[in-house]
């Protein structure tokens, strides 16, 4: 994988002596790829790429976004109108979010239709389903953060759905809203979920998902 000029350098030899990077490079570059693999097997990688774009653009917006019911909408307008390239960053975040959900759905269908969920890859499928749920949760929580009319009523409707569940329904609603009604508590919880809890969860399950794929390889044709 490395050229002779690189492998003969003192810097390379220093790292090789301590980390055995040649063995790591050989393992990465020599993994067998079945001949039946086509472009549809790239959907998972595209989903990951969309997530990385989401992470970068979302992190950039946290410098300007204010998670309060009185300032959230104004801070989003500030990002769009006054921050250098803010309109571009938020637009990329918005469209890559839609693309991530679409690619995730297509990836799930591809795995299901090609039988990639069967033995011995059941746990890979389970972690994938968990990742799908987390991805949708990103969409639900992120949709509310601009705190405009669309975001407010979307949160009100979504958080009110569990009220139909007997006994525990009202408790779940209050837990989701941070109180009896939609307000500052709701926005704070959704912001915390969107920027801290869900990113950590998706990182953990992505790591598990990739390690399993790396260990078991790509499933064979039907």
Curated annotation (Swiss-Prot):
<feature type="binding site" description="axial binding residue">
    <location>
        <position position="194"/>
    </location>
    <ligand>
        <name>heme b 2</name>
    </ligand>
</feature>
<keyword id="KW-0249">Electron transport</keyword>
<comment type="function">
    <text>Component of the cytochrome b6-f complex, which mediates electron transfer between photosystem II (PSII) and photosystem I (PSI), cyclic electron flow around PSI, and state transitions.</text>
</comment>
<feature type="transmembrane region" description="Helical">
    <location>
        <begin position="123"/>
        <end position="143"/>
    </location>
</feature>
<comment type="similarity">
    <text>Belongs to the cytochrome b family. PetB subfamily.</text>
</comment>
<keyword id="KW-0602">Photosynthesis</keyword>
<feature type="transmembrane region" description="Helical">
    <location>
        <begin position="193"/>
        <end position="213"/>
    </location>
</feature>
<keyword id="KW-0479">Metal-binding</keyword>
<dbReference type="InterPro" id="IPR027387">
    <property type="entry name" value="Cytb/b6-like_sf"/>
</dbReference>
<keyword id="KW-0408">Iron</keyword>
<dbReference type="Pfam" id="PF00033">
    <property type="entry name" value="Cytochrome_B"/>
</dbReference>
<dbReference type="InterPro" id="IPR048259">
    <property type="entry name" value="Cytochrome_b_N_euk/bac"/>
</dbReference>
<protein>
    <recommendedName>
        <fullName>Cytochrome b6</fullName>
    </recommendedName>
</protein>
<feature type="binding site" description="axial binding residue">
    <location>
        <position position="93"/>
    </location>
    <ligand>
        <name>heme b 2</name>
    </ligand>
</feature>
<dbReference type="InterPro" id="IPR016174">
    <property type="entry name" value="Di-haem_cyt_TM"/>
</dbReference>
<keyword id="KW-1133">Transmembrane helix</keyword>
<dbReference type="InterPro" id="IPR023530">
    <property type="entry name" value="Cyt_B6_PetB"/>
</dbReference>
<keyword id="KW-0813">Transport</keyword>
<dbReference type="GO" id="GO:0015979">
    <property type="term" value="P:photosynthesis"/>
</dbReference>
<feature type="transmembrane region" description="Helical">
    <location>
        <begin position="97"/>
        <end position="117"/>
    </location>
</feature>
<dbReference type="GO" id="GO:0022904">
    <property type="term" value="P:respiratory electron transport chain"/>
</dbReference>
<feature type="binding site" description="axial binding residue">
    <location>
        <position position="107"/>
    </location>
    <ligand>
        <name>heme b 1</name>
    </ligand>
</feature>
<dbReference type="InterPro" id="IPR005797">
    <property type="entry name" value="Cyt_b/b6_N"/>
</dbReference>
<dbReference type="GO" id="GO:0016491">
    <property type="term" value="F:oxidoreductase activity"/>
</dbReference>
<dbReference type="GO" id="GO:0046872">
    <property type="term" value="F:metal ion binding"/>
</dbReference>
<feature type="binding site" description="axial binding residue">
    <location>
        <position position="209"/>
    </location>
    <ligand>
        <name>heme b 1</name>
    </ligand>
</feature>
<dbReference type="GO" id="GO:0031676">
    <property type="term" value="C:plasma membrane-derived thylakoid membrane"/>
</dbReference>
<keyword id="KW-0472">Membrane</keyword>
<dbReference type="GO" id="GO:0045158">
    <property type="term" value="F:electron transporter, transferring electrons within cytochrome b6/f complex of photosystem II activity"/>
</dbReference>
<comment type="subunit">
    <text>The 4 large subunits of the cytochrome b6-f complex are cytochrome b6, subunit IV (17 kDa polypeptide, PetD), cytochrome f and the Rieske protein, while the 4 small subunits are PetG, PetL, PetM and PetN. The complex functions as a dimer.</text>
</comment>
<feature type="binding site" description="covalent">
    <location>
        <position position="42"/>
    </location>
    <ligand>
        <name>heme c</name>
    </ligand>
</feature>
<keyword id="KW-0349">Heme</keyword>
<keyword id="KW-0812">Transmembrane</keyword>
<feature type="transmembrane region" description="Helical">
    <location>
        <begin position="39"/>
        <end position="59"/>
    </location>
</feature>
<keyword id="KW-0793">Thylakoid</keyword>
């Amino acid at each position: 994988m490395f050229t002779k000029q690189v492998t003969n350098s003192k810097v390379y030899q220093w790292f090789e002596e301590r980390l055995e990077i040649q063995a790591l490079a050989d393992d990465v570059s020599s993994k067998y790829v079945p001949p039946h693999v086509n472009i549809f097997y790239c959907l998972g990688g595209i989903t990951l790429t969309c997530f990385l774009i989401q992470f970068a653009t979302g992190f950039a917006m946290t410098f300007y976004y204010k998670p309060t019911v009185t300032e959230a909408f104004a801070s989003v307008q500030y990002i769009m109108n006054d921050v250098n390239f803010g309109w571009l960053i938020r637009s990329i975040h918005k469209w890559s979010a839609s693309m991530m959900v679409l690619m995730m759905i297509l990836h799930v269908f591809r795995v299901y239709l090609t039988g990639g969920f069967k033995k011995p890859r059941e746990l890979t499928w389970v972690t994938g389903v968990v990742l799908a749920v987390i991805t949708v949760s990103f969409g639900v929580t992120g949709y509310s953060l601009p705190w405009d009319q669309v975001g407010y009523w979307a949160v009100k409707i979504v958080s009110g759905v569990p009220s139909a569940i007997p006994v525990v329904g009202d408790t779940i609603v209050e837990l989701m809203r941070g109180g009896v009604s939609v307000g500052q508590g709701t926005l704070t919880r959704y912001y915390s979920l969107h920027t801290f809890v869900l990113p950590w969860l998706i990182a953990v399950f992505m790591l598990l998902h990739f390690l399993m794929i790396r260990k078991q390889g790509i499933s064979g044709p039907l």
